[in-house]
């Protein structure tokens, strides 16, 4: 039986007017960018696995974002022939609200999270409390967590890579596909971060780190690691991926 996977982006909504330096630090001041919010279904030979669970647009609207809904979580999963009760595992890339706020909809699933990330979300630094609203902790405390530490192989086709910097326990998801290793970054980024314009490369940067970070140098090194390993990098908020049904 093949251990190759097919990755299905499930776009939930787009966010407009997002300050671009949050994605492309320290460049593009005064510019904004639109981004996608996704769940990722990893179609493979055995269990039903998704990466992240997204956030309902209503929660984003209360925080002042410009939001364009695409589909609900239920609608997106239904297109995959699934319901929330069919999901066996949720891989949590990191604990920011747009990646984990809908976790309570999956009562049967095991949530795979890095130990450093679980500790971070339970006791965030005051700087990050805006991204970890008080009720977020209440939403996730009843979840069934499977805690990992460091790089962890889930099966022959999926490996978790500890890629800290955006958050202390950010993890990227390396997926074996028919066209090589695809890596879902985990941290908040867009395609431009991995294909910076010539003037940025001339400044000596191989890529652009995220503007939201707990450790900037660590975030940069994690991004370099992913780019060097991956045959295909999947920037987790790249807007163009809303048009992709499958990867590769």
Spans of model-derived segments:
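Divalent metal-coordination and catalytic microenvironments
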Residues: 7, 42, 52, 87, ...
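Active-site metal-binding motif and surrounding structural segment of the metallo-beta-lactamase
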Residues: 68-113
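Hydrophobic/aromatic beta-strand patches that form the interior of the parallel beta-sheet core
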Residues: 8, 91, 112, 146, ...
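Beta-strand-turn-beta hairpins that frame and shape the catalytic cleft
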Residues: 2-7, 43-48, 152-160, 177-182
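Metallo-beta-lactamase
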Residues: 59, 71, 76-82, 86, 115-162, 168-246, ...
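Short, structured coil segments at secondary-structure junctions
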Residues: 3, 106-107, 229
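Conserved beta-strand hairpin/beta-sheet module of binuclear metal-dependent hydrolase folds
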Residues: 14-75, 79, 172-187
């Amino acid at each position: 039986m093949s251990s190759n996977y097919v990755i299905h982006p499930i776009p939930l909504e787009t966010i407009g007017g997002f300050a671009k330096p949050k994605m492309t630090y320290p460049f593009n001041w005064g510019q904004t960018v639109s981004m996608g919010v996704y769940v990722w279904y990893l179609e493979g030979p055995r269990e039903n696995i998704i990466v992240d669970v997204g956030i309902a647009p209503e929660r984003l609207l209360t925080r002042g974002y410009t939001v364009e809904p695409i589909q609900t979580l239920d609608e997106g999963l239904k297109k995959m022939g699934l319901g929330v009760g069919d999901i066996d595992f949720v891989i949590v890339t990191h604990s920011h609200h747009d990646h984990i706020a809908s976790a309570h909809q999956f009562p049967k699933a095991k949530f795979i999270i890095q130990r450093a990330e679980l500790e971070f979300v339970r006791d965030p630094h005051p700087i990050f409390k805006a991204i970890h609203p008080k009720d977020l902790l209440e939403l996730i405390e009843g979840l069934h967590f499977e805690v990992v530490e460091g790089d962890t192989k889930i099966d022959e086709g999926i490996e978790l890579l500890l890629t800290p910097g955006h958050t202390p326990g950010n993890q990227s998801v390396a997926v074996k596909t028919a066209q090589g290793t695809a890596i879902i970054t985990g941290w908040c980024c867009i395609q431009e971060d991995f294909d910076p314009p010539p003037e940025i490369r001339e400044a000596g940067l191989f890529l652009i780190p995220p503007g939201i970070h707990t450790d900037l140098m660590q975030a940069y090194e994690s991004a370099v690691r992913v780019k060097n390993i991956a045959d295909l990098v999947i920037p987790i908020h790249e807007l163009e991926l809303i048009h992709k049904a499958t990867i590769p």
